[in-house]
From Swiss-Prot:
High-level lineage: Bacteria, Pseudomonadati, Campylobacterota, Epsilonproteobacteria, Campylobacterales
Native source organism of the sequence: Helicobacter pylori (strain ATCC 700392 / 26695)
Any one GO cellular component localisation term in the record: TAT protein transport complex
Protein's UniProt name: Sec-independent protein translocase protein TatB
BP terms from Gene Ontology: protein transport by the Tat complex
PANTHER family listed in its UniProt record: SEC-INDEPENDENT PROTEIN TRANSLOCASE PROTEIN TATA, CHLOROPLASTIC
Subcellular localization: Cell inner membrane
Biased composition (Basic and acidic residues): 128-140, 149-160
Function according to Swiss-Prot or TrEMBL: Part of the twin-arginine translocation (Tat) system that transports large folded proteins containing a characteristic twin-arginine motif in their signal peptide across membranes. Together with TatC, TatB is part of a receptor directly interacting with Tat signal peptides. TatB may form an oligomeric binding site that transiently accommodates folded Tat precursor proteins before their translocation.
UniProt-listed HAMAP family: TatB (MF_00237)
Record's keyword annotation contains rRNA-binding: no
Amino acid sequence: MFGMGFFEILVVLVVAIIFLGPEKFPQAVVDVVKFFRAVKKTLNDAKDTLDKEINIEEIKKETLEYQKLFENKVESLKGVKIEELEDAKVTAENEIKSIQDLMQDYQKSLETNTIPNHLNEEVSNEEALNKEVSSDESPKEVQLATDNNTKEHDKEKENV
């Protein structure tokens, strides 16, 4: 303790006994021990407080790093999402335009009783079947077949 050996401590104790006397010496030892305990406690408290503050500073630094990382990721995601949304918007607009074109084609065909452009092949097949049916069947059966074709056309229109 304090760089003193056993012999030096013994000399200090003998001098203290001679100087203080046998009546005051025990009380002086108790006071010195209390003083060293208080100093030790104060130093430990200071050390703990310093450790906590250092730990808090480290946590603050880590928090700031995570915050910056999070903000960077959010910014990068904003850019990606905007690009993806633009792509989806363009695709949706193209699909809407395609559907509108089909609807206009159907409306024109209904107004003029002509066949829509995209159904020409299907209708020509149906006409060929109708011609075959008309040659083999009575007019009443041909009318039923035509009604069925009209119903199918209406169903397609509803689905679109």
